[in-house]
Curated annotation (Swiss-Prot):
Residues 145-155 have a biased composition (Basic residues). PANTHER family: SINGLE-STRANDED DNA-BINDING PROTEIN. GO terms for cellular component: nucleoid. Residues 55-61 bind DNA. It comes from Escherichia coli. Keywords: DNA replication, DNA-binding, Plasmid. This is Plasmid-derived single-stranded DNA-binding protein. Residues 6-110 form the SSB domain. Residues 118-132 have a biased composition (Polar residues). SUPFAM superfamilies: Nucleic acid-binding proteins. May contribute to the conjugative processing of DNA. It has a functional relationship with Psi (plasmid-mediated sos inhibition) proteins.
C-alpha cells in the first residue's frame, strides 16, 4: 500500500481560555481549545529578546473532549497530537476559512503541568488518548532484546470506544463566528 502523505500535528502550548464543550446530536462531546505556542529569539540588530506567539484552534472529540472540559483550564500546558484540517463556510456571501487541529480516535492529549489556581487537575503528566494504550511497564520492564530498563509507571486513562466525528465539515454544529 502506497503512502500518499502524512498529516500529523504535534503542539505543546498553553490554553488561552477554558475549553468550550458542546454535545452534538448523536450525543458525542466536542471541545474547542485555543492553544498558544511561542518562540523566542535574540534580534541580531538590536540584541533584544523577541517573542512570537501563534494561536491554534484545536478540536477534541468524544471522551477526550469530556476530559478536557473537566480538567483543563486557562493557562494549562498541554501536549496535543492530531491532524490539520481546513474547513470553509459561507457568511453573507463571503467564503470564510478556518484551519484547525482535529484530535480524533488516533490523537492524544496530555496535560503537562498545572495552571495557577487549578484545583481539579489530575496528576502532572496525566495522558489521555483516544486509542487504547498498552499497560505501562513495571520498574523492571524489558526492552527488545532482553535489556532491562527502569520505567516510570504512568497512569494512562483507558477510554471507552470512541464515537467517530460526524462526516462533513461542520462537525455537527454551526459556528457563525469561527473564533
Amino acid at each position: 500500500m502506497a503512502v500518499r502523505g502524512i498529516n500529523k500535528v504535534i503542539l505543546v502550548g498553553r490554553l488561552g481560555k477554558d475549553p468550550e464543550v458542546r454535545y452534538i446530536p448523536n450525543g458525542g462531546a466536542v471541545a474547542n481549545l485555543q492553544v498558544a505556542t511561542s518562540e523566542t529569539w535574540r534580534d541580531k540588530q538590536t540584541g533584544k529578546m523577541r517573542e512570537q506567539t501563534e494561536w491554534h484552534r484545536v478540536v477534541l472529540f468524544g471522551k477526550l473532549a469530556e476530559v478536557a472540559g473537566e480538567y483543563l483550564r486557562k493557562g494549562a500546558q498541554v501536549y496535543i497530537e492530531g491532524q490539520l484540517r481546513t474547513r470553509s463556510w459561507e457568511d453573507n456571501g463571503i467564503t470564510r476559512y478556518v484551519t484547525e487541529i482535529l484530535v480524533k480516535t488516533t490523537g492524544t492529549m496530555q496535560m503537562l503541568g498545572r495552571a495557577a489556581g487549578a484545583q481539579t487537575q489530575p496528576e502532572e503528566g496525566q495522558q489521555f488518548s483516544a486509542q487504547p494504550q498498552p499497560e505501562p511497564q513495571s520498574e523492571a520492564g524489558t526492552k527488545k532484546g532482553g535489556a532491562k530498563t527502569k520505567g516510570r509507571g504512568r497512569k494512562v486513562a483507558q477510554p471507552e470506544p470512541q464515537l467517530q466525528p460526524p462526516e462533513g465539515d461542520d462537525y455537527g454544529f454551526s459556528d457563525d463566528i469561527p473564533f
